[in-house]
Amino acid sequence: MKKTLVSLFVLFTAILASAQSRQDVEKLRTEVESNLVENILPFWLNNAVDPDGGFHGAIGIDGKAIKGAERGTLTTARILWTFARAYRQYGLEEYKVMADYAAENLINNCIDKKYGGLFWAIDGDGAVKDGTKMTYATAFGIYSLSEHFRATGNRKSLDTAIELGAKTFVCGVNKDR
């Protein structure tokens, strides 16, 4: 999945760099947006949510969950940011529902309530699988919760983002916790 995203980014950048006119750029923008709205967002809406709670750890190109895959909290934060931003851009209720679900999952299952930070991975029941805390994941958690607040006005997301920032970056990171 990572290779595909990197390849798409490189392709998009190359095409954009070679665009000869504003019309070419506009055509490319329209095609990319169409792919986002018609393919990418629906794929995640239809396949990411695990009926047992949270999100699948990995999904094949066929849309089927890969059993036993680790559930990275960074994925939850990325889903949250993506659908909050999509809701803010397009105003579709289904995007808000997905963003709200992701926010609740992130807040309730992925954050270390005692010391701050996002755990690296959780299991299917929401229990900590890998308690390592990476600054990148925590920063993306703050970023995604902030976007959720911006898109929906959800105060719990803003308060959680502020608390995460205070515990993690203002008070300092305790590597033992």
Residue ranges and their predicted role:
Residues 1-23:
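Bacterial Sec-dependent N-terminal signal peptides
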Residues 20-177:
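Glycan-recognition and catalytic cores of secretory/periplasmic carbohydrate-active enzymes
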